[in-house]
Amino acid sequence: MRAVVVVTGLVVVVVTTTLSLQDHDVKSASSPLSSSVDQGSSGDDCDEGLPPPDQPFRVVWNHPDNCEKINLHLPLDEYGIIFNKRRVFLGEEIQTLYDTGPWPYINKTGCFINGGLPQLFNQPDNSETCKILGKNRIEDFTGLGVLDFETWRAIYSTNFGTMENYQIESVNLVRKRHPDYSEKELKMVAEQEWQEAARKIMTDKLAAGQSLMPRGYWGYYLYPRTWDSKPDTKFRNNKIDWLWRQSTGLYPSIYIYYDVVSKTDSVITKFVSDTVGEAVRVQNDFSPPNTPIYPYVMFQTMDNVFHKEDHMKISLGLSAKMGAAGVILWGSSQNYKDFTTQCSRLQ
């Protein structure tokens, strides 16, 4: 039996699901770092792995709440919710890292920062990333290490919409060198160059975290994710198998973005099932042994509207049933602009 804690507004609901060892697709091993990784150091092997599959589903708190500073106590421990000591955002249980050193990107005005494109990024070593990550280094860290970079995507073809400039400029970069190439040839070379450059940047960043805190469970927020259809999702995610082979944690997002009254249970169930299901597939096909899945979950909108209790039960309960090791309850600093009010509502 697993007790799944669902936090929704002032109510904490315990959803009980029956799970046996066979319910889990998590591979057993002594360490999530026991197999080799691509393009980076995984650090020393260790004897300590995840709890056995029949251990409680873990709910991890990742909110910048500051509630204790105003003497408002959130009794997370009473409900088995795991949190960093002193409620720091970067702590011993979880670190969601937004600053991991320089990244190439195109800003809102079209300026190329740090080269703009991964292909033009010129960083001879990982020293700056190691320096920044080292500021939050915790000796014997065995928590969740999550790198969060969302300005462009690792898979070339998924840089569409507001990210389309990355495809356009990648093609232009090839055209400057090969003006005689056909449009098809330009796009083919642009994609190849993008994938190679993005791979080096992302694996180097991941390796920096793994070398500094080798017993942590390292991966990228939003990876893996789903796309238009299951075949399309599988095809695209298989292109970055190098990322799954190096990651020792998988951190997809099952955030529900919507007017809280507008989505049906079936729509949310399909979304959660597809997203967690793809993470399980990636885990089975590529991941090092004992790599955990921790979907990111929000229990309120950016407008501070709490999600429906039934929808939270779906998000957490289905994640547990499908084999995730736990979930991460994430909260935005935007929700805490008036943290006195927010803390009172949570309490």
UniProtKB/Swiss-Prot annotation:
GO terms for molecular function: hyalurononglucosaminidase activity. It catalyses: Random hydrolysis of (1->4)-linkages between N-acetyl-beta-D-glucosamine and D-glucuronate residues in hyaluronate. SUPFAM superfamilies: (Trans)glycosidases. Contains 4 disulfide bonds. Residues 1-18 form the signal peptide. Pfam families: Glyco_hydro_56 (PF01630). Expressed by the venom duct. Disulfide bonds join C67-C343. Belongs to the glycosyl hydrolase 56 family. This is Hyaluronidase conohyal-ad1. It comes from Conus adamsonii (Rhododendron cone).
